[in-house]
């Protein structure tokens, strides 16, 4: 199978404010990882620790600001890509946020977003799956080990592996 462009799978930790981004660039034909990116993002956690990721204010003290991260992603991967994500709603909002913070227009990117979760769920249901719709359970069905604390780059790589198993 050949996609029209390379696929950039993104994942963020943090819902209200992004505190970490992971990104994995996959070859449009082989889906082999060509490049990757990961960084924490400066944010005010109000002295709370993110329970799912273990990220604290101390972790973020030297992290780049959203604007810098948006510029870094733009310069590293450009816009001639398909953006993909696992449950894309929150990830795309955070991606738009860091791109806008960098003074860039999100419309430079193709508006077609590859959301891997629904494709994975449909694939499993079609093959007799009757388990939970939760990510952990679906990842497990595709052979992933339990994640423990969430890490954006690791989550991108798990999503990439699921995508490969669905389409290759």
Regions inferred by a protein language model and the residue ranges of each:
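Conserved non-catalytic scaffold segment of RNase H-like nuclease domains
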Residues: 1-97, 136, 140-144, 150
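Acidic, divalent-metal-coordinating active-site segment for phosphoryl/phosphodiester hydrolysis
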Residues: 151-164
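Substrate-recognition/cap helix-loop segment adjacent to the acidic, metal-dependent catalytic center
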Residues: 91-114
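Short alpha-helix plus adjacent loop in nuclease-associated cores
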Residues: 113-130
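Active-site metal-coordination segments of metallo-dependent hydrolases
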Residues: 128, 147-153
